[in-house]
């Protein structure tokens, strides 16, 4: 189950899914993709929400919606890990409701309480919450495939930045300085050594 609010994210998801389908053609898995953004002024008299806090609820709601379509008990696995999974506030701007808590254990536990209250036979789990991204990359069972696809993946919080700078033709770009980019760079360096991360950073 995937969501995108702009083109760069959607293109990355589509390409990665296509490559994984080709590599693991004997496994049965499909992609449910939802592209959704909200127009400014959608609710009269309410100012626009320029944060991404609401995406926490949206992501899980989409996953639960897909799970209920199976017609049986389901487990929604959310593969987030490391610092981003726990959302440790690094500065005052990240305290309280100023930042998303998409995969924080407390937030996920409240979601499971909500499912139980609503009588939905499903559960949210994050099996990798206690692993760093570097540990996950180093432990990958198919490191060759991971290295071949890593430049097609998108971690950046500002994927449109390269377009605004007039950079074209290099494919998916990462700004290199936002929190997800810094964690990506540290993780791939920890897993593969210095100089082996082929990600283009703007």
Where are these regions (language model features)?
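Nucleotide-activated chemistry modules centered on ATP-dependent adenylation/adenylyltransferase
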Residues: 1-202
């Amino acid at each position: 189950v995937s969501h995108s609010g702009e083109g760069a994210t959607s293109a990355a998801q589509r390409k990665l899914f296509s490559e994984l389908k080709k590599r693991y053609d004997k496994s049965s898995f499909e992609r449910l993709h939802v592209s959704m953004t909200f127009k400014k002024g959608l609710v009269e008299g309410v100012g626009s929400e320029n944060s991404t806090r609401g995406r926490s609820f949206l992501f899980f709601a989409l996953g639960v919606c897909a799970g209920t379509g199976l017609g049986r008990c389901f487990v929604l696995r959310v593969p987030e890990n490391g610092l981003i999974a726990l959302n440790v506030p690094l500065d005052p701007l990240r305290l309280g409701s100023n930042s998303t808590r998409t995969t924080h254990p407390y937030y996920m536990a409240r979601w499971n309480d909500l499912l139980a209250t609503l009588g939905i036979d499903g559960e949210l789990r994050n099996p990798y919450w206690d692993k760093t991204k570097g540990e996950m990359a180093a432990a990958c069972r198919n490191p060759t495939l991971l290295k071949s696809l890593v430049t097609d993946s998108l971690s950046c919080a500002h994927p449109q930045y390269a377009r605004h700078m007039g950079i074209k033709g290099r494919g998916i770009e990462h700004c290199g300085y936002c929190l997800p980019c810094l964690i990506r760079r540290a993780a791939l360096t920890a897993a593969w050594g210095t100089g082996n991360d082929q990600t283009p950073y703007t």
